[in-house]
Structure formats: C-alpha cells, structure tokens
UniProtKB/Swiss-Prot annotation:
Modified residues (S-(dipyrrolylmethanemethyl)cysteine): 248
Bias kind Basic and acidic residues: ranges: 316-331
Pathway(s) per entry: Porphyrin-containing compound metabolism; protoporphyrin-IX biosynthesis; coproporphyrinogen-III from 5-aminolevulinate: step 2/4
Molecular function per GO: hydroxymethylbilane synthase activity
Name of the protein: Porphobilinogen deaminase
Annotated gene: hemC
Cofactor(s) this protein cannot do without: dipyrromethane
Lineage of producing organism: Bacteria, Bacillati, Actinomycetota, Actinomycetes, Acidothermales
C-alpha cells in the first residue's frame, strides 16, 4: 500500500465552475491534512460548455461528468470529484467510487428576491428551476405559481434571480452552503414536503479501479475520506433510481437516513403536472442498502408509479439536472 508521503502529487480533476471547485477544495483539504500533495486540474464539461442549451437536448447522459471520466481513463488525472447527483447509476468497469464523504445538507432551498417563504409568494409568481423533480413537487404545493426553466451554474442562476427575471428559485441547500450563501435561502424544504434528488448533497470521489485494488497506489489513502453512513444512504437511493428506470427524465426523489443500525429510505415519483404522486418508505439495515432500494422501487412500480415514469417522454419537460440516466457518462 502506498503511503501519502510516498505519492508525488495527486492530481484532482474537477469541473471549472465555482461550486465544483469549492467541492473539490473540500476533498483536497482532507487529502492535504492526510499528508498528500495535491494539484487541482480544471476540466470543462459538455454541460458547462453549452450552458445555454436545455439539458434535455443533449444526447445520452453524464453531461457534467463525461470529460472528467475521460481524463481519468487517459491517466491525465488521478482522482475526479463529482456531485453524486450528476453521476449516472451504471458503472464503468475500469473506474470506482473510492470514497463518499460525509454528506452535506441534502434538502432543497427556496431563494426569493424579496426574502419571502413559499406560502407568501403571490399567485402567478415566476419560480425558476431546470428540474422536473422540483417543478412537479412544487406544483403539488403551489399549483398557482408559474414555473419556468433556468440553466447555468448556481452563481449564474442566482444572478438571474437578483436581476429580476424570477421571483424565486429552488436550488440545492448544499450548493448554497458550499458557496457560503446559505443566508440567501428564504426557506429550506423539509424532506416530508419536498424529497431531494438521489445523492443530493453528497460528493463522489472517483478513481481508476486498479489504483485502489490490493497494493494499488491509492489503496487506503482515499478510503479515509469515506463515510459509511453516507455511502449506505446514497447506495440505497441510487439503487432505487436504477430500478425504477433511471433512463427516464421522470421526477423522482429519494432520501436515505441512517440511524444506528437502521436505514430508512423514502422515495416519491410525481407526475410532471403535479397532479399525482406516489410516495413510499421502507426500513432496513445499512448492509442491505442496495436491496432496500430495489425493494422500494418495486413497491412504487406495483403502486402504479411506472405509468408516471413513462409520462415525461411526452411532456416536453426539460431533463432534470438532478437526475442520472442509465448511461455511464462514459466518453
């Protein structure tokens, strides 16, 4: 096993957005504390390069991760850091998620120009989100609001809000926190009100599988970043997403919570129009996270959620940036 001191420089690949760099700095700081020398390498993703193109117009999946994975496979970087919610559920055999650090706040947050809460927004107020999951759950709560798509990184979206184009935005609480802008949130949605995207708030530290195999150069170094409770929760969420049909742009929310030796998984599938929702919960153990996710997916499908999963193909809804397709995001 290679020690941190024996490594020359560990190259961390990241998207170039401010939020992505902040996420990568979290990992870099932990590695430096463990004695590693770290170099951060910025890589432009397809999704960032074409920020004016609606996400549903991109072919395939992994628009925010494919270039990072390509650089990893070519040996140009040693590790890449992803937002877990951007990572497709299908694996690339040569790559492995070496660590899932402790999760940040998984909730969705409402940011409003006037600082008012959701219940205080006037009828017809324009709310921006590029996520069918958020849009559908918002329609359940406030069908009188006007929901419009919005693209761009978090800084860009917040700028559009403050320029007056929207009355409110729904964004990830973790993104606000990592940019030190949590004070701009008017409201944080309890998961009983709005379930987040699978993996929301979590980071994925990915490397070449051979590098963490027995005797691999990174074996042991990246493992120290892993949080078992977060890994179990995210594993259950992603297993559910894959089992219900992750290739669809359907509004699916899921959140796992580990308490002692218990893992509770809550999930929802919502009609894009916000008229119908199927919500179910199951409890199991962290060791059976994948099976728990698959069993809850089966419960949802038996309840009729599979009909909603087919609906987005005819709705014209934009692809959800919080969702992952069955594709690997492989270049």
């Amino acid at each position: 096993m290679t020690t941190a001191a024996a490594l020359s420089v560990l190259r961390l690949g990241t998207r170039r957005s401010t939020l992505a760099r902040a996420q990568t700095e979290e990992i870099a700081g932990a590695l430096r504390a463990a004695g590693c020398r770290v170099e951060i390498v910025g890589i432009q993703s397809t999704g960032d390069r074409h920020a004016d193109v609606p996400l549903h117009e991109f072919a395939g999946s992994g628009v925010f991760v494919a270039e990072l994975r390509a650089a990893l496979l070519r040996g140009e970087v040693d590790v890449v850091v992803h937002s877990m919610k951007d990572l497709p559920t299908a694996e690339i055999p040569e790559l492995a998620i070496a660590a899932i650090p402790r999760r940040a706040d998984p909730r969705d947050a409402l940011v409003t120009g006037a600082g008012c809460r959701l219940a205080e927004l006037p009828t017809g107020a324009i709310v921006g989100t590029g996520s069918p999951r958020r849009a559908a759950q918002l329609r359940l709560l406030r069908p009188d609001l006007e929901i419009r798509p919005i693209r761009g990184n978090l800084d860009t979206r917040l700028g559009k809000l403050h320029a007056g184009g929207y009355a409110a935005l729904i964004v990830a609480a973790a993104g606000l926190a990592r940019l030190h802008r949590s004070e701009e949130a008017a409201e944080f949605f309890d998961p009983t009100v709005m379930l987040p995207a699978p993996g929301q708030g979590a980071l994925a530290v990915e490397c070449r599988r051979a590098d963490i195999a027995d005797g691999g150069r990174l074996a042991g170094i990246l493992a120290g970043l892993d949080d078992p409770a977060t890994r179990a929760a995210v594993t259950a969420e992603r297993a559910l997403l894959a089992a219900v049909g992750a290739g669809c742009s359907a509004p699916v929310g899921a959140l796992g919570v580990v308490t002692a030796d218990t893992l509770q998984l809550d999930a929802v599938v919502v009609d894009p129009s916000g008229t119908t929702a199927f919500r179910r919960s199951l409890t199991g153990t962290p060791d059976d996270a994948s099976d728990l996710g698959r069993r809850l997916a089966a419960d949802l499908i038996r309840a009729g959620a599979d009909q909603l999963l087919q609906a987005p193909k005819q709705t014209g809804e934009p692809h959800d940036p919080d969702r992952h397709d069955k594709g690997t995001g492989r270049p």
